[in-house]
Swiss-Prot record:
It catalyses: 6-carboxyhexanoyl-[ACP] + L-alanine + H(+) = (8S)-8-amino-7-oxononanoate + holo-[ACP] + CO2. Its cofactor is pyridoxal 5'-phosphate. This is Putative 8-amino-7-oxononanoate synthase. The keyword Iron does not apply. Pyridoxal 5'-phosphate binds at G108, Y109, S180, D205, D206, A207, H208, T234, L235, S236, K237.
């Protein structure tokens, strides 16, 4: 077909650049030792940070809800899809995040898009970090407000942008709490300080911080002891289930319920997923020394920058040949020249697993003349 010829040309461009992707078949529960495409591998790229996705207590909670509510919600929350489990989980999230209320979305992606496409108005401006997640970028694109991008966690540049945007009616500073490709933590205390000085609102996507940062895992707010206006999050990482949420004031949540299209027109996540997530809330430098460029703060994400996309793919293939699954991260997920192996450490990994990982990185790095 004519369309296939055109699409194949576009796919060939991706292949030549080393950024063509394909799917891998993961067999079994999301634990470190998994069978991938028929090969036994140790997985180092999962977001199951606390090991809860395979926790028996979550599975039991989901099974009990499945027996009572069935496999799907069969409607949007505003029609027939709302259940006691959705409401219980929202109350649990609000309590955990120390906000007045929370609202569930089908994913963290849809939560960001829903908030940013509905809340800021035409006379407003969104100030967005340069390395914010794709869902924030897409939400900004769909918003009626203008968008101004500031340099990654550069507070001087953010302040300059705040000075330059004082003509707008309202300003929203939007940032990841933990940046998923670098593992760096946003200086949220400094952002809150600037927001107060310049009368701006702060929206934080805590997808990779919830359950990980802070003394009780409440995220960047607890880590820094500050309170942003709005917190976005996901249930698919440390919480171990599926779905996303927005948390803030009761008025804000009422607004989203009536205006966020990604909430109004979505089928609600299954009650069983809500029950499992509710249970999850109830449970509560060697690489650098080798000579690798290692980014990241005190989070489970450890990005090891290789640089060239083709070499990164080769590195990932050699890892897999040694029984280690850590896929190559390439453009457009990261900038050109920033291709990397993104390692995520989970509570299910043993010290023996970590030792094996380090030894393998050392040998492959030497073989490919990276270190």
């Amino acid at each position: 077909m004519k369309i296939d010829s055109w699409l194949n040309d576009r796919l060939d461009i991706a292949k030549e650049a080393g950024v063509h992707r394909n799917l891998r078949s993961m067999n079994g529960a999301p634990v470190p030792e998994r069978n991938i495409d028929g090969e036994n591998q140790t997985v180092w790229s999962s977001n199951n940070y606390l090991g809860l996705a395979s926790d028996r207590r979550l599975i039991d909670a989901a099974q009990t809800a499945l027996q009572q509510f069935g496999t799907g919600s069969s409607g949007s929350r505003l029609t027939t899809g709302n259940s006691v489990w959705h409401e219980k989980l929202e109350k649990k999230i609000a309590s955990f995040k120390r906000t007045e209320a929370a609202l569930l979305f089908s994913s963290g992606y849809l939560a960001n898009v829903g908030v940013l496409s509905s809340l800021p108005e035409k006379e407003d401006v969104i100030l967005s970090d340069q390395l914010n997640h794709a869902s924030i970028i897409d939400g900004c694109r769909l918003s009626k407000a203008d968008t101004v991008v500031y340099r990654h966690i550069d507070m001087n540049d953010l302040e300059n942008k705040l000075n330059e945007t004082q003509r707008y009616q309202r300003r929203f500073i939007v940032t990841d709490g933990v940046f998923s490709m670098d593992g760096t933590i946003v200086p949220l205390d400094q952002i809150i300080s600037l927001a107060k000085r310049y009368h701006a609102f702060v929206v934080v996507d805590d997808a990779h911080a919830t359950g990980v940062l802070g003394d009780s895992g409440r995220g960047t707010s607890e880590y820094f002891g500050v309170y942003p206006d709005i917190v976005i999050g996901t249930l698919s990482k440390a919480v171990g289930t599926e779905g996303g949420f927005a948390a803030g004031s009761a008025v804000f949540i009422d607004f989203l319920l009536n205006h966020a299209r990604t909430f109004i027109f979505q089928t609600a996540i299954p009650p069983a997923s809500c029950a499992a997530a509710h249970e999850a809330f109830n449970i509560r430098t060697s690489l650098k020394n080798m000579g690798y460029v290692v980014k990241g703060d005190h989070t489970p994400i450890i990005p090891v920058v290789i640089g060239d996309a083709h070499k990164t793919v080769i590195f990932a293939e050699k890892l897999q040949g040694k029984g280690i699954y850590a896929p190559a991260i390439r453009p457009p997920t990261v900038a050109p020249g920033e291709s990397r192996i993104r390692i995520t450490i989970t509570s299910d990994h043993s010290m023996g697993d970590i030792d094996d990982l380090l030894k393998t990185f050392h040998s492959i790095g030497k073989e490919l003349h990276i270190i």
